[in-house]
Amino acid sequence: MAVYNLSINCSPRFVHHVYVPHFTCKSNKSLSHVPMRITMSKQHHHSYFASTTADVDAHLKQSITIKPPLSVHEAMYNFIFSTPPNLAPSLCVAACELVGGHQDQAMAAASALRVIHAAIFTHDHLPLTGRPNPTSPEAATHNSYNPNIQLLLPDAIVPFGFELLANSDDLTHNKSDRILRVIVEFTRTFGSRGTIDAQYHEKLASRFDVDSHEAKTVGWGHYPSLKKEGAMHACAAACGAILGEAHEEEVEKLRTFGLYVGMIQGYANRFIMSSTEEKKEADRIIEELTNLARQELKYFDGRNLEPFSTFLFRL
């Protein structure tokens, strides 16, 4: 496995055998390699993301039945579709297509990612929990429900995501092994050692004293960005590749790409409103991660990589 020289003082970590730089200090040195250029107009970028998001939502609307008790199923429907979409479902579809698969092969997994993201978002925006931005305008629909619904319903949404995966199995196409592998990927990513662990650490970080060293650096954001957004997007890319019948090296290259893309999203989301010094440091880390992500795509030179600029485009 190639480990790129970041020219910074960092401690390596590994997630699913993927090298992850642990940024701990500033550096005025740049990467020695020249990043690969992938260009796409801003209009095309939004068009690709909007198109795949619309396809995923259409698939979900066919899959979700609003039935009694309405207090559960109607709220589930509203929570899922009012949650701002992230890049993971689109990345899952793009990875599948890159390795020769069709969008339909990845649609159930992409929809499950959308569903589980909604559950995570709901838990992140519970009122009166001390979490960052618990009253975000984006969570207005969620916060219109009673706290007991907000607290318990995400735990019902997650199994629905796994149900989507299980129901996508088709014995006539001999894909049971791939579906099972994707389910395992999901359990690792969204279980107690994945997203839940990241949410716990983010909760701890929200309690930092405003004068503490941790509160004045971007270091506290590394672990949540790694285990939350990073792990989710790594899972998305790997699952898309698996469902597209990729070989192992392709799966791992796309997993690594997804990890870096997710971490970019994590740092951008956490430090977009930070002080000038924090924002500058976060931007430096994002630039490093962007270059690393581009390096992973070099393996796929000669294929249609245009959609992948969607995931490196700074919103």
Swiss-Prot record:
Binds 2 Mg(2+) ions per subunit. GO terms for cellular component: chloroplast thylakoid membrane. The keyword Chloroplast applies. The keyword Cell membrane does not apply. Dimethylallyl diphosphate binds at residues 228, 265, 280. It is a peripheral membrane protein. Keywords: Chloroplast, Magnesium, Membrane, Metal-binding, Plastid, Thylakoid, Transit peptide. Mg(2+) 1 binds at residues 124, 130. This is Heterodimeric geranylgeranyl pyrophosphate synthase small subunit 1, chloroplastic. It comes from Cannabis sativa.
